[in-house]
Amino acid sequence: MDQSKRYVNLALSEADLIKGGRHVLCAYRMRPRPGHGYVETAAHFAAESSTGTNVEVCTTDDFTRGVDALVYEVDEAEGLMKIAYPVDLFDRNIIDGKAMIASFLTLTVGNNQGMSDVENAKMEDFYVPPEFLKLFDGPACNISHMWKVLGRPEVNGGMVVGTIIKPKLGLRPKPFADACHQFWLGGDFIKNDEPQGNQVFAPLKETMRLVADAMRRAQDETGVPKLLSANITADDPAEMIARGNFILETFGENASHVAFLVDGFVAGPTAVTTCRRNFPDTFLHYHRAGHGAITSRQSKRGYTVLVHMKMARLLGASGIHTGTMGYGKMEGAPDEKMVAYMLERQIAEGPYYRQDWGGMASCTPIISGGMSALRLPGFFDNLGHSNVIQTSGGGAFGHKDGAIAGALSLRQAHEAWLKKIDLVDYAQTHAELRGAFESFASDADRLYPGWRDRLRIAA
């Protein structure tokens, strides 16, 4: 059934839709299946995403038609389709009238992903109007909270030097806590890897008691505050709350030094919101494990990394993993700095829409995935600043002289970048950074040709 007369209005102006403030706008790359027209398929997509189905129904009235999603722009040659969704379509909480990402996802990338006339469709960007944006929680705290705990300036406080305890699974409570203590003697921040929780060989309560003690000892030995991101992800919100309360009680006077990690992609908006609303004073660390199945450049369905990041900020993530923009081991490219800017800035340009965040707090980029001291300067050059949380697993524990030296090498690489000193030159007077060149020699050969001669290290 051709629904284009009802669900397509190419006379609508995007500027007028934005000025009106009553529509969420979404841009998709869409390809119809062979034998189906582009505009007709786009119309069916909009219908399925809002008020329609595959047939006309007798219960439709004029009010219903007034909240139709409308295709307002198509470019068949580019495979581009833009749809305007009236804000009244989206579900609101009965307890406080707030908007929810679950409803946004259900409409914009729900049933339309499985339609028989759609070969593939992927959301590339979306725009939220000002009044509707106010209905989302947004972040309660961000990296400035960590800088304050660390005793740094709350503006431009610089990189938080972090790690992920490796191996990601298989450590019992004491070896895990010992590894934390070692890294904290040189670094700032430790996160649970996303699978770490309450395994039978590492019960959460026993582990957290030992880690809390390790933090106290490291702070006493260094005179510097330390930070931990503890995984509270669970299927049951009550379990998440129980874990969170136990961890805060266990860390006691250092409770403000704790962040909560939530596997936001696999556990979903409910888990993120559970943390955001029950622990508003705690940094909400959104881990995105699994997202690549949807957001990868290889995937032609679902949504992009940028869309995922924007949803995380709306949900209230304090920080989210953004990848390494091609400088680490994960898929990415330098132009993905747009993703970080969308999280950090009050006004940011996406590929299709400029988003004004209306004063909503920023969300912090968390950098991880194959990063070592040698890769940091190029990453910072591309991003243009170093106000990120950086977590290196192998980049710290893979250092030839151990975790303390690994942490110090990361800190020294950051110092060199801030001072605009060549990394090889800085390594000549900083033993831990020099050790990073020896530890990650293949990176050094690729990024710093001639480093062996300059550091007088034999091949």
Curated annotation (Swiss-Prot):
The basic functional RuBisCO is composed of a large chain homodimer in a 'head-to-tail' conformation. In contrast to form I RuBisCO, the form II RuBisCO are composed solely of large subunits. Binds 1 Mg(2+) ion per subunit. The keyword Cell division does not apply. SUPFAM superfamilies: RuBisCo, C-terminal domain, RuBisCO, large subunit, small (N-terminal) domain. InterPro entries: RuBisCO, RuBisCo_large_chain_AS, RuBisCO_lsu_C, RuBisCO_lsu_C_sf, RuBisCO_lsu_fd_N, RuBisCO_lsu_N_sf, RuBisCO_lsuII. The active site is at 166 (proton acceptor), 287 (proton acceptor). Substrate binds at residues 111, 168, 288, 321, 368. The keyword GTP-binding does not apply. Belongs to the RuBisCO large chain family. Type II subfamily. This is Ribulose bisphosphate carboxylase. Its cofactor is Mg(2+). Keywords: Calvin cycle, Carbon dioxide fixation, Lyase, Magnesium, Metal-binding, Monooxygenase, Oxidoreductase. GO terms for molecular function: magnesium ion binding; monooxygenase activity; ribulose-bisphosphate carboxylase activity. It is an enzyme of class 4 (lyase). The lineage of its organism: Bacteria, Pseudomonadati, Pseudomonadota, Alphaproteobacteria, Rhodospirillales. Mg(2+) binds at residues 191, 193-194. Coiled coil: none annotated. It catalyses: 2 (2R)-3-phosphoglycerate + 2 H(+) = D-ribulose 1,5-bisphosphate + CO2 + H2O; D-ribulose 1,5-bisphosphate + O2 = 2-phosphoglycolate + (2R)-3-phosphoglycerate + 2 H(+). The modification N6-carboxylysine is found at residue 191. RuBisCO catalyzes two reactions: the carboxylation of D-ribulose 1,5-bisphosphate, the primary event in carbon dioxide fixation, as well as the oxidative fragmentation of the pentose substrate. Both reactions occur simultaneously and in competition at the same active site. Its EC number is 4.1.1.39. The record marks 329 as: Transition state stabilizer.
